[in-house]
Amino acid sequence: MATETTTATPTAPSATTAEITPLPAFSPDLYQRAWASIPHPSLPLIATCHAHSVTVFSLSTLSKHSVLTGGHTRSVRSAAWQPPRGKVSGKEAKRLRLVTGSFDTTAGVWTWDQGRREESLEREIRLQSGENDQEAEEEEEAEDEWELTLVLEGHENEVKSVNYSPSGQYLATCSRDKSVWIWEDVGNPNPSSEEEDEEEEDEDEWETVAVLQEHDGDVKAVAWCPDVPGRKGKYAPPRRYGDDVLASASYDNTVRLWREDGDGEWVCVAVLEGHEGTVWGVAWEGRPRENDKFPRLLSWGADEVIRVWSLKEPEEEEHGEGAAGGGGNNTWGFGVPNTMRRSLKEEWECTAVLPKVHKGDIYSVAWSTETGLLSSVGSDGVLALYQETANTTEKNEENETNGEAPTTTSAGGWKVLTTVKGAHGPYEINHITWCKRYDAGSERKGEEEMLVTTGDDGVVRPWQVRIQ
């Protein structure tokens, strides 16, 4: 269930100025439509989907690192890095895996080949640490050393999006066939030692645990809620189901939220309605909220609107021992039949609609985990930057006079800081993401953030963002 309000939570003082400037593009240009660029969660690598391939670029050198090719017969639309599972150490690279979603109806699981992976990735780690390693800089890029180790089949039409849960245990895929599939990694669960990891690192075994078919149209995107304190904190829903929550966006103009109930069944717990066109994507808030409130959710689409959704805070009594299944009469816990449990439905509300900037479909929005800034791109070629602010209304007439989008604040407390028109020339921009900087021009390698846009022109372009 979803309702719409215009409440806002005051935030830190607003920035007065913002500047977005282009950095040298990743090389080489791809010279064909590119769909998305996905940064690795911890290594200085970013994977770009295009044609039948994925090109992995180095964030240290802004050049090609490796290529995944030969596994798909149609365009690769999406990709996701598997988060490290079990013990995390300097040998984390041994479990480097990427999943790709393709228009050929399949998802592919790729592993970096052991023969060259350690040498190449250790080079990236040296560059990441800021060492002035001239020899590393001059090394030739590695040959294509990716191996397609598993193909996930089941969808009847194009796979539009793939996304891992925070633990890496689950993978979600969605398709034009109106379904969302959830897969579980059962090949190497929670390795407890480096020796065990060494023995099992090449095992890839996935099982289908759910096929969700409640959307009435093409499912465009899926996104798992990140593992931030609010996901399990005071304002998290009572334990009538597991911690993982998945959001899906659809051609049917809705967003659906999914959770695993006490019987291990994945169920729809909320339908978010309000968009007047296809919902192209969803993104979760990655920064912890004040008082450990549950993470908010973004949605955007063909109606040129970006919405912010918040979980309605439950009544205090719902957090009692009975609701949590931890004692008392266990009235609503896991130990009673489905028919006797309280409804699994959650109530979400639209707490903000961002100021309108785009004239055309909004294809991608990114939410910074460091600053909380939002950035958006779409079919009009505009790159926009937003900031959350106090619940006031402002308008910067100077921006409007200069032909820029006027700086305004919506009822929900967001304003436009700046825009870049024609960020990829006349071409549509399909994707935007925040990621860490490791290149030579960075003043704080591994800490400073930049934006990366991916467009129909085949250019993967980084952008420096300066806020004052």
UniProtKB/Swiss-Prot annotation:
Keyword Repeat: yes
Higher taxonomy: Eukaryota, Fungi, Dikarya, Ascomycota, Pezizomycotina
Organism name: Neurospora crassa (strain ATCC 24698 / 74-OR23-1A / CBS 708.71 / DSM 1257 / FGSC 987)
This protein's UniProt keywords: Repeat, WD repeat
UniProt protein name: Probable cytosolic iron-sulfur protein assembly protein 1
SMART domains per record: WD40
Region (Disordered), start-end ranges: 185-204, 314-335, 391-411
GO BP field: iron-sulfur cluster assembly
Matching SUPFAM superfamilies: WD40 repeat-like
Function: Essential component of the cytosolic iron-sulfur (Fe/S) protein assembly machinery. Required for the maturation of extramitochondrial Fe/S proteins.
Biased composition (Acidic residues): 193-204
Gene Ontology CC: one annotated term: cytosolic [4Fe-4S] assembly targeting complex
First and last residues of every WD repeat: 71-122, 154-193, 214-268, 274-319, 357-396, 423-468
Top-level taxonomic group: Eukaryota
